[in-house]
From Swiss-Prot:
This is Membrane protein insertase YidC. Belongs to the OXA1/ALB3/YidC family. Type 1 subfamily. It is found in: Cell inner membrane. It comes from the Bacteria. One of its GO terms (molecular function) is membrane insertase activity. GO terms for biological process: protein insertion into membrane; protein transport. InterPro entries: Membr_insert_YidC, Membr_insert_YidC_N, YidC/ALB3/OXA1/COX18, YidC/Oxa/ALB_C, YidC_ALB_C, YidC_periplasmic_sf. Required for the insertion and/or proper folding and/or complex formation of integral membrane proteins into the membrane. Involved in integration of membrane proteins that insert both dependently and independently of the Sec translocase complex, as well as at least some lipoproteins. Aids folding of multispanning membrane proteins. The gene is yidC. The lineage of its organism: Bacteria, Pseudomonadati, Bacteroidota, Bacteroidia, Bacteroidales. It comes from Bacteroides fragilis (strain ATCC 25285 / DSM 2151 / CCUG 4856 / JCM 11019 / LMG 10263 / NCTC 9343 / Onslow / VPI 2553 / EN-2).
Amino acid sequence: MDKNTITGLVLIGILLVGFSFLSRPSEEQIAAQKRYYDSIAVVQQQEEALRAKTEAALANEKEETAADSASLFFSATKGKEAFTTIQNNLVEITLDNKGGRVYSALLKNYMGQDKKPVVLFNGSDASMNFNFYNKKGALQTKDFYFEAVNKTDSSVTMRLAADSASYIDFIYTLKPDNYLMSFVIKATGMDGKLAASTNYVDISWSQRARQIEKGYTYENRLADLTYKYTGDDVDNLSASKDDEKSVSERLDWIAFKNQFFSSVFIAEQDFEKTTVKSKMEKQGSGYIKDYSAEMSTFFDPTGKQPTDMYFYFGPNHYKTLTALDKGREEKWELNNLVYLGWPLIRWINKWITINVFDWLSGWGLSMGIVLLLLTIMVKIVVFPATWKTYMSSAKMRVLKPKIDEINKKYPKQEDAMKKQQEVMGLYSQYGVSPMGGCLPMLLQFPILMALFMFVPSAIELRQQSFLWADDLSTYDAFITFPFHIPFLGNHLSLFCLLMTVTNILNTKYTMQQQDTGAQPQMAAMKWMMYLMPIMFLFVLNDYPSGLNYYYFISTLISVVTMIILRRTTDENKLLTELEAKKKDPKQMKKTGFAARLEAMQKQQEQLAKERANKQNKK
């Protein structure tokens, strides 16, 4: 460092020291500033003291208000949380003394993905509160500690006591071999202590439905909040978006539903003034839906009549749910929790599919074999309709050379009406109806759709393996991608891929079968017919492997049937038979659809000629 730099730094230092000395405040200024800050501190202390006093007053007011309404059960406002378990051979229920509510529900005979018994909910997953009323306000059971009395292995009474002679009992009882739990609310010695004019209890119930199955997308699609109108039909909230509804009608029950399991709350005296909500949960959160319901039901504060209710924590198994109505005059119809399709298809599944499926399952066969046999049986039932559809197409196919001649005769577009009229006349002469295969196809559609609706709801397929699929109730991912493909997901289902391939083959044979030349525009639509199976690959990739397996087997049988019928049908002989019918005078009479269509075409042609003549005269 040179001499000039050192000199400059020294001068700068002297300037800074001198400036600091000259700019310092005087003693009067320092004293005034100290008084100013002291006054601010005093004001702040006063404000803090006032705020603390106000908050304490508000807290005391809240405590006094709560104490006024809860003074009836003052001794129950303090306690230590404890749990009581009741069980039978099917279900284990844990009850919490805080609020006297159901804390958790475990199903012993059904395993989760972790190979442990399925837990429908536990702890903070669910909540339940009952509001009783006295002259001073609401008594919320969630704020009180109940006492467990009269405990057995399968029943317990959770008691909220005002004193030894005045209390409200929540009585829980599990029946043997049953997922149904009786729940009775009964007041004893509360006459005059609860508002006699209030003959109802308000209930708040909520549950976050856990993701129990492997496939979030499909399980979420079949999970919804369902409820049944008293003496009427069943309704539900949307399963695909957040939904809320206020229900003015009386309800028999409300169900928080997963794909294969449900938590159902049933009221013998009905629910009323009900509001139900369902919110979607994010994928990966471990939950699929957040359900909640607020409702009221009958309650007798005098204790003369108990409030009878039930909980059902169990599988969505059709016959299990149906059995709950045995001996009841007013049916709960909880079997509506199992979706079996539209009315006609549901009827087929209810009376035929389920019974045949149970019969085959009783042989102790693999569920994959049961589905195979069931599919074959369905194909046998619909074979007469399949054969009739095929023969109708075969007759039209052997007439294709004659149709081609008509097409050559009328090559111009303006002659389309004449060409169509002559084609229909040809069909009529040979006794062939172009719509002959449509009715049989429509008749077999409900039967084929019945299985399509039944398989995804069949809890019997849950965790049942077959070939490479470890669970027929969810997708079989034989390839898993480290990324997400739009509309496809992060995996590829092998049964879905096989189903797609067989559908393409089926489309090919069907198009060949229907290539009669009568509809040239079909050539432009062929690519759409081949596109449909590709679309199915994206749509059904997340669907249960059991469903894709059924669809694959069903389509494969259709392809094989088509090939066999094609090879065993002598088309020359068929044409000879048609020629013989043409020569038969009885066949010359135009009847049915073809005759009506031909008559309409002639009428349209006549009207067109009349309009043309009028225009020429002008």
